[in-house]
Amino acid sequence: MNFWNFLEILLFIGIVAAGLIVAVMIKTAEDTTLFDRTQLPEDNPQKLNYYVQPPPNGDEKVPFPTVFEPAKVYTTFVVPAYNEEKRIPKMLDETVEYLKSREAKDKSFTWEIVVVNDGSKDKTKEVVLNYAKDYPNIFLLNQPVNMGKGAAIQAGCLHARGELVLMVDADGATKINEFEALETEIKKLMKNNNQAIVVGSRAQNEKANRTPIRKFLGLGMHVLIVLSGVRGIHDTQCGFKLFSREACKMLFMNQHVQRWCFDPELLVIGRRLGMKISEIPVEWNEIEGSKMKISGMIKMAIDLIDIAIFHRVGAWTIRDRRINK
């Protein structure tokens, strides 16, 4: 085999490899968003249906409203939950206590908690339904199979009734009273733009209690996040973010990333749509059992590469009109 034949073989292998990579990328880019799957006709087997299942309706399944309908309450608290039967009771107790206290001081302060059960294998669903028996403001949105934290947040926000929508983790790492700081900030932003996002930041608060290893890994991930297109945000991954209803309408029907790294994509979409985005410090403490495995970080890195490529080349298009369904 001479040199030129060797080069031809290398070129052929390179073309085949490139073709496979492009094919995979195109397939990934063509995947519909969760929003698209909720809009499919009733007889389509891929259609996603979400139901609220609290008593006193018994076993009756009641369809959720959508974020495209008029708001019914002041704030929706969206809580993604996967195998959280042990941790979510404490979080719900603290949240309900805070919300009832606010409600007692201000009758116009209306609220709901939407817990999105993301295919839990434990008793998370039953625990939440028990709370729903006592509190008509608590709803269960059930995903029969695990689809990822991003999918859970997306589903909850697409079906929120609130004028404001807060995503908050089930582990209670950020205390719910930090909501007031985000609430004050988003009201300032909404004076000039009703599409607004406020990001809770652990990086800006010295009270954030993280181990050195977590800080180091977080720094490496932040470099990838910047490359994905996020600008001006120090901490994209804190599970405490507040959205205006108008922002929710645009963000979550365009979200593609379904698992851990959905937050940067939301910020990329918001930036491209000219939304007002702000970041403020929150008190946050690392909770036992909240650590991410190395395999999870690798998947996050892949998601960030997808965001950087697909949004830049237009494979993931952003719909810039409201869709009322």
UniProtKB/Swiss-Prot annotation:
Residue ranges, Cytoplasmic side: 27-215
Membrane topology per record: Single-pass membrane protein
Transmembrane intervals: 6-26
One family name in Pfam for this protein: Glycos_transf_2
EC code: 2.4.1.117
Domain of life: Eukaryota
Positions on the Lumenal side per record topology: 1-5
InterPro entries given in the database record: DPG_synthase, Glyco_trans_2-like, Nucleotide-diphossugar_trans
GO biological process: protein N-linked glycosylation
Alphabetical list of Gene3D superfamilies matching this protein: Spore Coat Polysaccharide Biosynthesis Protein SpsA, Chain A (3.90.550.10)
Reactions that this protein is recorded to catalyse: a di-trans,poly-cis-dolichyl phosphate + UDP-alpha-D-glucose = a di-trans,poly-cis-dolichyl beta-D-glucosyl phosphate + UDP
A GO MF label: dolichyl-phosphate beta-glucosyltransferase activity
Major subcellular location class: endoplasmic reticulum
Compartment annotation: Endoplasmic reticulum membrane
Ranges in coiled-coil conformation: none
Pathway, per record: Protein modification; protein glycosylation
Protein keywords: Endoplasmic reticulum, Glycosyltransferase, Membrane, Signal-anchor, Transferase, Transmembrane, Transmembrane helix
GO cellular component terms attached to this protein's record: endoplasmic reticulum membrane
Function field: Dolichyl-phosphate beta-glucosyltransferase involved in the glycosylation of glycoproteins through the synthesis of dolichyl beta-D-glucosyl phosphate which serves as a sugar donor for transfer of three glucose residues to the Man-9-GlcNAc-2-PP-dolichol precursor to N-glycans.
Similarity remark: Belongs to the glycosyltransferase 2 family.
Protein name, UniProt field: Dolichyl-phosphate beta-glucosyltransferase ALG5E
Record organism: Trichomonas vaginalis (strain ATCC PRA-98 / G3)
